[in-house]
Structure formats: structure tokens, C-alpha cells
């Protein structure tokens, strides 16, 4: 049977063994996951016996124009294969990532010594998601923010081209590559950075990144903060130092005065004659005058007596043993 799988296999083996007459250069096709792609085929052969499509080394579809027979080798491809407009161009739908590869088509005719072939290379790509942007090490010196932005895809898609757009300047700039070096000084007009990721079937944009937000730490530059801190601390420390020095001299002067005063007091105690009383330090008490009547002496009524100390003293011990009795004292020459 002309359309049996055994016959198709024999035709494919015969084609591989005998070689083929190439009709043209390799054609590259691009498709997206879930989409469709058409392998164009234009044949100049008037009488076509069969057309065989293969994927890598596996027969995919065989067409027999005379009987209008289309044989799909694998059942899973029956709903995916189509030949639009009644031609021989192959349309493959519901593309998968593993559909990427090399496709051949061979046109067999009794009028040709070798089959006419055409080679295709199919690349199936996924639609790109939003690219991710990461920031490298940031340096803030003198209010200038210097860092690198890196754009990448989370799933590592193939054949992705990255481009950066810098918006906000007089002329918008573009930068090719996944890494964008930036330098932005605090106080300048704000800038917006956007990463654009492209592949042959799609493109996507990152979220906009504001330089002011990215470099908000530049205003808090450690060096600038340190300078400001020094400018504030130096006068304060200098004032504290001067105050401490003044208090130290004052304390020292008071200690010296105290030592001198103590020495003077000690000298005055040892030699009182050397330290005459100073009028400045003398204090006087004022005694109020009281009216007192001074009695005049009356010689006629005055009694005078002469008291002589006894020549013999009593023994002190005997005085202790004597009872408390009044003693009679002898007075001589009482006038």
C-alpha cells in the first residue's frame, strides 16, 4: 500500500541513503509557545509523487497528492498539523518549547533523479515576563550616588536582549546591555530608569526606577554626616575644654590661697608677737553707759582690817579627816 507506514519508512530511508538535491538555503523560523508557525513550500515540480516532512530524524507527515492522502506519523500531532489553502506548506500549531529543532521536506517525483529538499530551523520562544532589576553595591561620596543596575529574567529565557532607557534629562538616553552604570548627584533633576527585555517574539518592561528613591541614601552620605558631626562636636568639645581648664585654674588658685592662709595661721600661733592685731581685723563691742550712782567714801564709817596668812599650814590629809565644822581664825591688830 502506497500510504502505509512501512512504505513511508522505506521512502525516508531511501531518501537518506541516496541523498537529496537541495532547493535553497536553510530557512529559520520563529514561533512562540502556544502559537503557530508555517513552513512555506513552493515546488516547481509538475508531477509530484509524494512529499515527506520530517522533524530531526523522525518522519512527521507524508502527503500523496494523487490520492489526496495525508498521513500523520504520530497521533499526538494530528490536531496540530494542517496544510492551509490546499497547498503543501506545513502549518504546525500549539507550539511547545521542545518543538524547536530542524525540519526537512522532501519532494519525490519520477521526473527527478533525487528528491528536492528544503531545510528549516525552528526556534520556539516563551513570551517574556516582566524583567527583574537588582542593584549592586552603592557608593555615596560627596552627595553623589554611584551604583549599577542589573536587568535579568527570573527563568533564564533564551536570546533575550536588554536595553535601558534613561528618562528625565534634556535628551533621553539608551544603553545596551543588562548592566546600567549610573551616577546621580543629590539635588539634580530626578531621573527614571526602565529596562526593556526583548526576544524574537515579545518584549516587556521593568517597573520604573526613580534615581531619587534609589539614591535616597546619598543625602545621608556617611562622609557628609561625619563632616557635619565634626563641625558640631569640635566647638562643643573646645568649649568644654576651656570651661574645664578655667575651673581647674580657679580650683588651683583657691587651694593656693587656702595653703597660704593656713601657713600664716600656723606661724601666728607659734610666734604671736610677729602677728600684731590689725586694726582692720579688730572688732570692738560697744557697751552702753548706764547711769550709776557712785557712793562717796565715808572715812568715819570705814573699817579696815589686816589679814595675815598663818605661818603653819595644816596637813592636807588631816583636813580630809576633819568634820565639816566651822573654824575660828585668829586675826591680829583688828582696828
UniProtKB/Swiss-Prot annotation:
A motif (ITSM) lies at residues 302-307. The keyword Cell membrane does not apply. The chain crosses the membrane at residues 227-247. Proposed to be involved in systemic lupus erythematosus (SLE) disease process. GO terms for molecular function: identical protein binding. InterPro entries: CD2/SLAM_rcpt, Ig-like_dom, Ig-like_dom_sf, Ig-like_fold, Ig_V-set. The ITSMs (immunoreceptor tyrosine-based switch motifs) with the consensus sequence T-X-Y-X-X-[VI] present in SLAM family receptors have overlapping specificity for activating and inhibitory SH2 domain-containing binding partners. Especially they mediate the interaction with the SH2 domain of SH2D1A and SH2D1B. A 'three-pronged' mechanism is proposed involving threonine (position -2), phosphorylated tyrosine (position 0) and valine/isoleucine (position +3). The gene is SLAMF7. GO terms for biological process: adaptive immune response; cell adhesion; immune response; natural killer cell activation; natural killer cell mediated cytotoxicity; T cell activation. Residues 23-226 are extracellular. This is SLAM family member 7. It is found in: Membrane. Residues 131-206 form the Ig-like C2-type domain.
Amino acid at each position: 500500500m502506497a500510504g502505509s507506514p512501512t512504505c513511508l519508512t522505506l521512502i525516508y530511508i531511501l531518501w537518506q541513503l541516496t541523498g537529496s538535491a537541495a532547493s535553497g538555503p536553510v530557512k529559520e523560523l520563529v514561533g512562540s509557545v502556544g502559537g503557530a508557525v508555517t513552513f512555506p513550500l513552493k515546488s516547481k515540480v509538475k508531477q509530484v509523487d509524494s512529499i515527506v516532512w520530517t522533524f530531526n530524524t523522525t518522519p512527521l507527515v507524508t502527503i500523496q497528492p494523487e490520492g489526496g492522502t495525508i498521513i500523520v506519523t504520530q497521533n499526538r500531532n494530528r490536531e496540530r498539523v494542517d496544510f492551509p489553502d490546499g497547498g503543501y506548506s506545513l502549518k504546525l500549531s500549539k507550539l511547545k518549547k521542545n518543538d524547536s529543532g530542524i525540519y526537512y521536506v522532501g519532494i519525490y517525483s519520477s521526473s527527478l533523479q533525487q528528491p528536492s529538499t528544503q531545510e528549516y530551523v525552528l526556534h520556539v520562544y516563551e513570551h517574556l515576563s516582566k524583567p527583574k532589576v537588582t542593584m549592586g553595591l552603592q557608593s555615596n561620596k560627596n552627595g553623589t550616588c554611584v551604583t549599577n543596575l542589573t536587568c535579568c529574567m527570573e527563568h533564564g529565557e533564551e536570546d533575550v536582549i536588554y536595553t535601558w532607557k534613561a528618562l528625565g534629562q534634556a535628551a533621553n538616553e539608551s544603553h545596551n546591555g543588562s548592566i546600567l552604570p549610573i551616577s546621580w548627584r543629590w539635588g539634580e533633576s530626578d531621573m527614571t530608569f526602565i529596562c526593556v527585555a526583548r526576544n524574537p517574539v515579545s518584549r516587556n518592561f521593568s517597573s520604573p526606577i526613580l534615581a531619587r528613591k534609589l539614591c535616597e541614601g546619598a543625602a545621608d552620605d556617611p562622609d557628609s554626616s561625619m563632616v557635619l558631626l565634626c563641625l558640631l562636636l569640635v566647638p562643643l568639645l573646645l568649649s568644654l575644654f576651656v570651661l574645664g581648664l578655667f575651673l581647674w585654674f580657679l580650683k588651683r588658685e583657691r587651694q593656693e590661697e587656702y595653703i597660704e592662709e593656713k601657713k600664716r595661721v600656723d606661724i601666728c600661733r607659734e610666734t604671736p608677737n610677729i602677728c600684731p592685731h590689725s586694726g582692720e581685723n579688730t572688732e570692738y563691742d560697744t557697751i552702753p553707759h548706764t547711769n550709776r550712782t557712785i557712793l562717796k567714801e565715808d572715812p568715819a564709817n570705814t573699817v579696815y582690817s589686816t589679814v595675815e596668812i598663818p605661818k603653819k599650814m595644816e596637813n592636807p590629809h588631816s583636813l580630809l579627816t576633819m568634820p565639816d565644822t566651822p573654824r575660828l581664825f585668829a586675826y591680829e591688830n583688828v582696828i
